[in-house]
């Protein structure tokens, strides 16, 4: 038997304030069954969550959704996070933000903004987002963010429809005044797995996009930081998902369920505790879902005897379940997995000529109107 797993305090909290969103991105990682507005935590409950997070040692509060700007109490939430010493990062589509609201958020103590873009070309970007005018609106929001003195990161998800413009998206981020850009190839969870056939690029597309972005590191050294999340379907080893299950971060859903990762609900049989019934401290240290895949005792072969088991932790549990039906199995991305042929077949299909044509998206459900000020 291995020694008991040492559980350190978390450093990050992803707060999904709402699932409401005016966009309908086909790669959205939100669950297929979206939480309703009526079921969301109220302001007082979220304030309690952030207070407990700070007491637990959390340093960073990532305010996400859906679209967090759909919450009328967003400024109040940011002000409270600042008052308890949390660094706040707003992850937003920009839709629902005005120049006045951004200034109010900055005055309340907001530390950072991450703004998503869907492409470097307006027509394609709006098509991907399922929202006409989104591209133009995001450029205005970026200008308002930098005018308010807030540091800006631009996020771009790469897939078949925009892979040829990965480098242009880096250049767009520079033009928008961002200090950092995250170029992330699609991770297939939530709506992303529904749309995998439409989203997955060919290997040639992925390789070209990766090379283009990597070449820009030297071009823009000292100008912008480039974070690059490459696709794992063409890799030999799996990603160290979340840095290991329930090791660094936790996620609170709009209704108060606390998850080890945003896709954990896709694994059946896990018991998720809710902030309405338990403190964050109790959830982090004692909840069954958080302890399900901590350490290495749960691992099967080939992970159990693998020298990389403390490096990639067997890969992603959610992906393992999605592709094998067994959350304890090795992530099939790994070339040592007995199920690796499933990943290879999916990647090979993306390379076939008939699969490389445009496939209609199944857009993310439940589009909410932009909230009134």
From Swiss-Prot:
Enzyme Commission number(s) from the entry: 1.21.98.4
Span of domain Radical SAM core: 7-227
Alphabetized GO MF terms: 4 iron, 4 sulfur cluster binding; cyclase activity; iron ion binding; oxidoreductase activity; S-adenosyl-L-methionine binding
Subunit structure of this chain's protein: Interacts with PqqD. The interaction is necessary for activity of PqqE.
Family of the protein in this entry: Belongs to the radical SAM superfamily. PqqE family.
SUPFAM superfamilies referenced in this protein's UniProt entry, alphabetically: Radical SAM enzymes (SSF102114)
Protein name: PqqA peptide cyclase
One family name in Pfam for this protein: SPASM
Pathway: Cofactor biosynthesis; pyrroloquinoline quinone biosynthesis
Co-factor remark: Binds 1 [4Fe-4S] cluster. The cluster is coordinated with 3 cysteines and an exchangeable S-adenosyl-L-methionine.
Gene: pqqE
Reactions catalysed: [PQQ precursor protein] + S-adenosyl-L-methionine = E-Y cross-linked-[PQQ precursor protein] + 5'-deoxyadenosine + L-methionine + H(+)
GO biological process annotation, one example: pyrroloquinoline quinone biosynthetic process
UniProt-annotated binding residues for [4Fe-4S] cluster: 21, 25, 28
InterPro entries tied to this protein: 4Fe4S-binding_SPASM_dom (IPR023885), Aldolase_TIM (IPR013785), PQQ_synth_PqqE_bac (IPR011843), PqqE-like (IPR017200), Radical_SAM_PqqE_MftC-like (IPR050377), rSAM (IPR007197)
Cofactor: [4Fe-4S] cluster
Keywords, comma-separated and alphabetical: 4Fe-4S, Iron, Iron-sulfur, Metal-binding, Oxidoreductase, PQQ biosynthesis, S-adenosyl-L-methionine
Job of this protein: Catalyzes the cross-linking of a glutamate residue and a tyrosine residue in the PqqA protein as part of the biosynthesis of pyrroloquinoline quinone (PQQ).
Presence of keyword S-adenosyl-L-methionine: yes
């Amino acid at each position: 038997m291995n020694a008991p797993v040492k559980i350190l305090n978390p450093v990050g909290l992803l707060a999904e304030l709402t699932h409401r969103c005016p966009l309908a991105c086909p790669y959205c990682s939100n669950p297929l069954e979206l939480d309703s507005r009526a079921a969301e935590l109220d302001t007082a409950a979220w304030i309690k969550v952030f207070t407990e997070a700070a007491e637990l040692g959390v340093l960073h509060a990532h305010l996400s959704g859906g679209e967090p700007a759909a919450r009328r109490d967003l400024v109040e939430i940011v002000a409270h996070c600042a008052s308890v010493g949390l660094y706040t990062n707003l992850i937003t589509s920009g839709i629902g933000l005005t120049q006045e609201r951004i200034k109010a958020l900055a005055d309340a103590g907001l530390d950072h903004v991450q703004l998503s873009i869907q492409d470097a070309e307006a027509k394609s970007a709006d098509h991907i987002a399922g929202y006409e005018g989104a591209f133009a609106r995001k450029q205005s929001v970026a200008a308002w963010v930098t005018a308010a003195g807030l540091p800006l990161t631009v996020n771009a998800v790469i897939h078949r429809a925009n892979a040829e413009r990965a480098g242009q998206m880096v250049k767009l981020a520079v033009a928008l005044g961002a200090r950092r850009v995250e170029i992330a190839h699609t991770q297939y969870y939530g709506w992303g797995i529904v749309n995998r056939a439409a989203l997955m690029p060919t290997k040639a597309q992925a390789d070209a996009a990766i090379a283009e972005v990597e070449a820009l590191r030297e071009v823009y050294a000292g100008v912008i930081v480039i974070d690059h999340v490459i696709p794992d379907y063409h890799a030999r080893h799996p990603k160290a998902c979340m840095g290991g299950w329930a090791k660094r971060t936790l996620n609170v859903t709009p209704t108060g369920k606390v998850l080890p990762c945003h896709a954990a609900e896709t694994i059946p049989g896990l018991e998720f505790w809710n902030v309405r019934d338990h403190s964050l401290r109790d959830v982090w240290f004692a909840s069954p879902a958080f302890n399900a895949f901590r350490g290495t005792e749960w691992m099967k072969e080939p992970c159990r005897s693998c020298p990389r088991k403390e490096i990639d932790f067997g890969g992603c549990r959610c992906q393992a379940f999605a592709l094998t039906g067994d959350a304890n199995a090795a992530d099939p991305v790994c070339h040592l997995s007995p199920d690796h042929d499933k990943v290879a077949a999916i990647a090979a299909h993306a390379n076939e000529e008939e699969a490389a044509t445009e496939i209609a998206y199944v857009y993310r459900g439940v589009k909410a109107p932009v909230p009134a000020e």
